[in-house]
From Swiss-Prot:
ATP binds at residues 10-17. The gene is tmk. Keywords: ATP-binding, Kinase, Nucleotide biosynthesis, Nucleotide-binding, Transferase. HAMAP family: Thymidylate_kinase. Belongs to the thymidylate kinase family. GO terms for cellular component: cytosol. Its EC number is 2.7.4.9. The keyword Kinase applies. This is Thymidylate kinase. It comes from Cupriavidus necator (strain ATCC 17699 / DSM 428 / KCTC 22496 / NCIMB 10442 / H16 / Stanier 337). It catalyses: dTMP + ATP = dTDP + ADP.
Amino acid sequence: MRGKFITFEGIDGAGKSTHIDWVADRLRARSDIAGVVTTREPGGTSLGEDLRQILLHRKMHLETEALLMFAARREHIAEVIAPALERGKWVISDRFTDATFAYQGGGRGLATERLEVLEDWVQGGLQPDLTLLFDVPLETASERLAGARAPDRFESESRAFFQRTRDEYLRRAAQSPQRFRVIDATRSIADIRDELEKIIATI
């Protein structure tokens, strides 16, 4: 039986990464699951991690950025995601294609139609079974990022960029309510995990 594919999404500072290992551990405790793989984008493979460093720290044209994102994703799918799903394992990815539509599409303004062509070519019919969108106002995200490590190229973007990115995430969630669950990530970790527990119990 094919495994399930779960993605975590949200703007920088939304707090999604705090919950990935917790959800993975909850799923590993279930007797009906063959195993759980946690991964991330960009990254997840040796080549993907090299591309991640370029994407996070090197200036480039916006179309180059999108193409590199999908190049890393193709490798990620071929080497990690698809094989794990075929073996019946569940895969949890910190970001996937929704992030590209939000950041490169919403944030950068790259045409959705171009991204859809790349999505179809790179992924075929592969889509997450569940996408958890951790949503916070920009003020909350900024407060959480303040004083953290030196910001990368994306974290250094303008407030307007992140507003467009957040708006695109929410637009995609509204378009695909059967796949998305929008999490109010301004709440306490305990409250968020109570909600996550209920969500993962249904899949």
